[in-house]
Design a protein with these regions (language model features):
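GST-like domain detector, emphasizing the conserved glutathione-binding G-site
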Residues: 1-144, 148, 167
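A generic structural-conservation signal
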Residues: 45, 223-224
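GST-like fold's C-terminal all-alpha helical module
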Residues: 118-213
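C-terminal active-site "lid" helix and adjoining low-complexity regulatory extension at the edge
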Residues: 220
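Carbohydrate-binding/catalytic loop surfaces
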Residues: 228-229
Length: 229
């Protein structure tokens, strides 16, 4: 890649360069950063943490809608919702395509992203990762009941993803890296840090093989969050 994965270097600022608003640690912000990295797009990250005690800045352009991160701005176009942003990044910029050409394959990628957002993200990140790996930072014990309740939910979501993962790989949809890989990787980077999450992934051979390869990609290494340390 000839352009930086994270922010613009001095002298690279351009009115055409996109701006990404959000906290670097956020799963959905990372999915967008991964898409930008894989496309080789230079961008500027403006740190916005809507979960901070003081909340988002009053002048945050998107705070009057759903107070969401990430948000994205490019050539006057303003977007929010990570899956909309990653699709825009794929179509608006040069670089390797992150969506298949065929309608069935494209539908499969969209299906995987939908499963991640609707069934996997909340139990894996908020119930498993936050409780097991971050509760102590807040000075409290992990909520074991919450963790136990999340495990069957995660198992069901990962079972569906295991069935949809291409048997020959190396990526979820086959030989080509797609947005499905990026959205799932952003979530598993946290979820797999909890022993319960790691065990659930390891028990599914296709996903486990995929994750071991995906986590080594330069884009993953260059977008690591301090929370992964």
């Amino acid at each position: 890649m000839t352009k930086p994965f994270f922010n613009l270097r001095p002298g690279e600022a351009s009115s055409a360069a996109p701006i990404l608003y959000g906290a670097a640690y956020n799963v959905y912000v990372r999915a967008v950063r991964l898409a930008l990295a894989e496309k080789g797009v230079a961008y500027r990250l403006v740190e916005i943490d809507v979960g901070a005690e003081e909340g988002a800045p009053a002048n945050y352009l998107y705070s009057t809608t759903f107070m969401h991160i990430p948000a994205f701005e490019h050539e006057g176009e303003r977007l929010y919702e990570a899956s909309a942003i990653t699709r825009y990044v794929d179509e608006a910029f040069d670089g390797p395509a992150l969506m298949p050409l065929g309608p069935r394959e494209r539908a499969r990628v969209n299906q995987v992203i939908s499963i991640i957002e609707n069934y996997a993200y909340r139990p894996m990140v908020w119930s498993i990762f936050i409780e097991r790996c971050r509760a102590s930072v807040s000075g409290r014990s992990a909520n074991e009941a919450k963790i136990a309740a999340a495990i069957p939910q995660i198992a069901a979501a990962l079972d569906a993803l295991e069935q949809l993962t291409d048997a020959n790989g190396p990526h979820l949809a086959g030989k080509r890296l797609t947005l499905a890989d990026l959205h799932l990787a952003a979530m598993l980077a946290y979820g797999s840090l909890a022993p319960e999450g790691a065990a659930l992934v390891k028990a599914r051979p296709r996903l486990s093989r995929w994750w071991e390869e995906m986590r080594q990609r330069p884009s993953m290494q260059d977008t690591r969050s301090p929370l992964e340390e």
